[in-house]
Structure formats: structure tokens, C-alpha cells
Amino acid sequence: MEKRIGSILLAVCLLLLASCGAKRETVAVEPDIAAQSSVPEADLTSLRQLSQEGALWQLDGTTLYTTVAAPQSRGKLLQTVDLNTGKRQALCSKPGCTHQDESCGAWLDCESEIAVLPMEDGRLVLVYGRYGPLEKQGAELSAAVELRDTSGAVLCPATPLPHRPSGAFYTDEIAVYYLREQWQEDGSADVSLIRIELDAAKGFGQASTAAFWQLPVMLSLTERCTEQGMLAIRWEHRMEGQTQVVQHRELCLVQWDGTVRTVAEAKDEQAFLVPDTGAIAAFCFDSATGTMARLDLATGESEPFARLPEGLQLTEGSACVGNVLICNFIQDGEAKPFYLEKGGEPVEIRRQTSHNGYLRPAMVLDVLEDGRLIVDLGDLEYEESYTDQTGQWITSRTSETLLGVCTPEQYREGAADCLTLETNHKF
């Protein structure tokens, strides 16, 4: 049985940060960086992010969508979890169904990554790697998109996509979009914003390029978008002895109209933090003084936000809820998440969770619309038994990740009072 939620990688970004930059004027970029749209009806200014890479899938904070391996066949089963009660059920309306194999209404012909993208009108867009007739010997790994309603009924059947998507997904409520990056030998990237049609009358599943950029070597998209475009960070690296240090230079907005606007400029050893989930925001941390500042994305101006211990180094994993920032640092080689409230004292989150026998801090995985957090509570280990292809009875140990829902304030206190979501093992 597979794990539902992958581990959050705590890879240290060796950043020594100082202060935030000032307002800069919009600058036009070279023609080869300009966005090119082949979809006139695409309204990119209304795009909202549906998920981040490896994210949980939920829309309004009431229902979580997830998948598990089908117990008695290949493929997967689509399940829902009520985020107010923690109860889990298969997304299947067949009377008397046992939810075991491909006869279940929740079954998907899926063998790898899947994205469940809830739309505001109640439809579910499913994007996943495929088994079966779409997979040709020696061909590029295939993917499919299909459309279902909230009962699990298929509205548009699985339709092949030209390549397998990865990373974040976006929507304008008419279509869904994702970024496709193709790296060149010189380190630059050809980045396409791919649009997937959802209207059956216009060719459900048809993929087209809504925007295209040729980004220079050291300009990296963050996957967070605003009405104007995609947030990005321009960076460079330098050597300190035998250590390569990544150093941010500019926080930028790669705009839909093909220009790149510098939001804030770094000096000396400065860098920026764009939270992975929750509110779209940008921060600047000074490692030498422990000062965290918040940036205005329109003007680039900064205001003090919080002060932390000196010498911390930012690492991956962050969430923003109103005036609360939760982010992860490395101190003396150890990962430490902190709860920061504007103008308040920082609180180190000391709750530890176990993953494959290793302890690590309880991590925030997503932010719900009502401001609650989905938190990784560690692994639930248990025995499972099954009959293999030879008819032999097999017993083995496996695990799945426990998830909890809590308010930011409950998380600050160690998430002891959080709502624990029902696991597939219990289900």
C-alpha cells in the first residue's frame, strides 16, 4: 500500500539574508522572453492556483480528495475526507459496492501521480498517469484527463494528454493550466503555460499553449501567481571555500504581457521567501539580525514583520495565513519550524512526528479557505495481509501518513487539539 502524502524535503538553501529592496520600475524584456499566447479566450488575469506540487486537493475547506491503491486490482480508488468530521468514504454512488476493484465507481485507471482538481461549480478535473491502451511500448509516459461530478459520475471520459503534467495546476474556471519547463543545455528554460480545455463542445482535453517564455539561466518561477503574472526569483551562486552558496538578487513578476517587473532588489547577501501555500505574499529575512520583513508586491516596499534568533537559515516549507507566517529554518543542522505573528514573539514548534523511524517537526501541508491548517502528524504503522499471485498468504508491515486539521493558534500550541482525519487503514 502506498503512502498518500509524500515526505516534505528539508533541503537547506544556504542563504544569509539582510534587508528588502525598494520600488522598481517595470522593464520590458528581450523579445525571446516575451509571452506568446495562442489561446485568445484565455483570461490569465483571473487564474488562481489549484494546487502545489505534491499538494492535497481541496477547494473550500470542507472536503479533501485523495486516492488509494485498489485492494483487489490495479489502479486507484478516489476517496473524500470530510474536513469538519474527519470521516472518509469512497467517491462512489453504486449501491452495495465494496470498493475493492475496477467495478467500483471510484476506480481510476491510474498507475502514478494524480491531481484531483475541484472546480467552483462542483466538477472534479482528474489528471493522472495511465495504464492501458494509452500506454504504448517505448512511448513517452502517457497521461489522461477526465471530468466527474461530486457524486463520482463520469461527465467526460479519460482523454489522453500530449505529455505528463507535473507541478502546480491553475484555473480560470473555464479551463485548467499547468507549467511545462524544458531545460536547455545552457541552463535556460523554455516555459509553457499549457491550457486543458474542459468544454466538451470545444474538445474536452485538448491541450494548447496559453503563454510561453524563454527564461534566462538564473530566473526561476515560484509557481505562485497573481493577477499580473507569475512570481519569480532571480539568483546567482558564489563559492565560499568548497561550498556553493545560492544568493537571491531580485524578486520579480513575470507578467502575462511578456514583461518582467522587478518587485524588490537584493543587495549584498539578501534573499526572499514566497510562501508555498496560503495567502500570496513575499517576505525578506535577515539572517544576521533575525529580522523578517513583509514586502508589498505592488510597490516593493517593506515593513517589519517579526524578529527571530540570529543565524537561522531558511529552508523549504512555508505557509501564510493573514498576519501569521509559518516557516522552517535550520539551526545547528536541525530543522525547526517557527510560528510568526506580525509584531509578536516567534514561537518554535517543538512537536515531533515519526516517519520511517526518524523524528522530524510537525509540518504544515496546506491552508484551507477558512484559515485552518492541514498538518502532517507522522506515520501510522500497521500490518496488512493479502494473497499474492501464487496464492500465498503474505503479511507485511506498512504505513500511511496521519493528517490533522487545526487552527494556526492550535498549531502554535503543538497541534494537540487538532482534528485527526480518518486513515484508509481504519476506513
Features from the language model and the residues they span:
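Surface-exposed loop/turn elements that mediate protein-protein interactions on large endomembrane-trafficking
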Residues: 29-48, 75-101, 135-160, 185-214, ...
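N-terminal export/targeting and maturation segments
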Residues: 35-74, 274
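C-terminal motif of bacterial Sec signal peptides marking the signal peptidase cleavage site
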Residues: 16-19
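Residue position within the beta-strands of beta-propeller blades
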Residues: 65-67, 125-128, 177-180, 232-234, ...
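Bacterial signal peptide processing site
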Residues: 21-23
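Residue-level signature of beta-propeller blades and closely related beta-rich strand-turn architectures
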Residues: 70, 130-132, 182, 236-237, ...
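Repeated scaffold domains used in trafficking and secretory/extracellular systems
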Residues: 49-59, 100-118, 162-173, 214-227, ...
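Bacterial N-terminal signal peptides that target proteins for export
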Residues: 1-9
